[in-house]
Amino acid sequence: MVCEKCEKKLGRVITPDTWKDGARNTTESGGRKLNENKMLTSKKARFDPYGKSGFATCRICKSSVHQSGSHYCQGCAYKKGICAMCGKKVIDTKNYKQTSV
């Protein structure tokens, strides 16, 4: 659950740049340099799931949050009726019997 204010942050489309702007075969865009040893530099660009990333832990259940910029996981946000990103109350869950299963 995300409020209307935080929904604008999610509205970005995750697509690569156009070919000329972010082409991989140019050195100015951060691509590989000429005669670069790929074995030495590939360790920095590799994805590390347990390392320091943009994902935090949920403030309620302390589990991993699967959305960057969020403070609450989707299960806790649904149960409490709050926004997963900012924690603002979205719906009143007083008369609901909600489960996250």
Swiss-Prot record:
A cellular component term from Gene Ontology for this protein is: cytoplasm
Q: Name one Pfam family in it.
A: Cript
For the biological process aspect of GO, one term held by this record is: cytoplasmic microtubule organization
Any keyword Cytoplasm?
yes
Q: Does the keyword Methyltransferase apply?
A: no
Localization terms from the record: Cytoplasm
Q: What does this protein do?
A: As a component of the minor spliceosome, involved in the splicing of U12-type introns in pre-mRNAs.
* Family of the protein in this entry: Belongs to the CRIPT family.
What is the name of the protein in this document?
Cysteine-rich PDZ-binding protein
Per the UniProt record, the source organism is: Danio rerio
Whichever gene encodes this chain, its name is: cript
